[in-house]
């Protein structure tokens, strides 16, 4: 899970990409919700914002504007 705009968002489905990067862990590195983590990248596929239904990434991004380079916590 991560927090964004004071809301908890659960990651329900994701893919780990074993790829080198220079970003701080937690940094959003693309507009498709790819998150830098440790020594790879987490590509989020499905998530659920608190008190809302589960959405695939395309549905979520239609209603939520998270900017690239945002550091998620």
From Swiss-Prot:
Keywords assigned by UniProt, alphabetized: Protein biosynthesis, Transferase
A GO molecular function held by the record: methionyl-tRNA formyltransferase activity
Source taxon at top rank: Bacteria
Protein name: Methionyl-tRNA formyltransferase
Family as reported in the entry's similarity comment: Belongs to the Fmt family.
EC number(s) from the headed UniProt entry: 2.1.2.9
This protein's record includes keyword DNA damage: no
InterPro entries, per database record: Formyl_trans_C (IPR005793), Formyl_trans_C_sf (IPR037022), Formyl_transferase-like_C_sf (IPR011034), Met-tRNA-FMT_C (IPR044135)
Function: Attaches a formyl group to the free amino group of methionyl-tRNA(fMet). The formyl group appears to play a dual role in the initiator identity of N-formylmethionyl-tRNA by promoting its recognition by IF2 and preventing the misappropriation of this tRNA by the elongation apparatus.
């Amino acid at each position: 899970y991560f927090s964004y705009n004071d809301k908890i968002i659960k990651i329900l489905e994701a893919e780990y990409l074993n790829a080198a990067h220079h970003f701080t862990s937690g940094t959003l590195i693309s507009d498709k919700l790819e998150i830098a983590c440790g020594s790879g990248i987490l590509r989020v596929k499905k998530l659920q914002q608190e008190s809302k239904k589960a959405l695939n990434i395309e549905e979520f991004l239609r209603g939520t504007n998270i900017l690239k380079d945002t550091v998620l916590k």
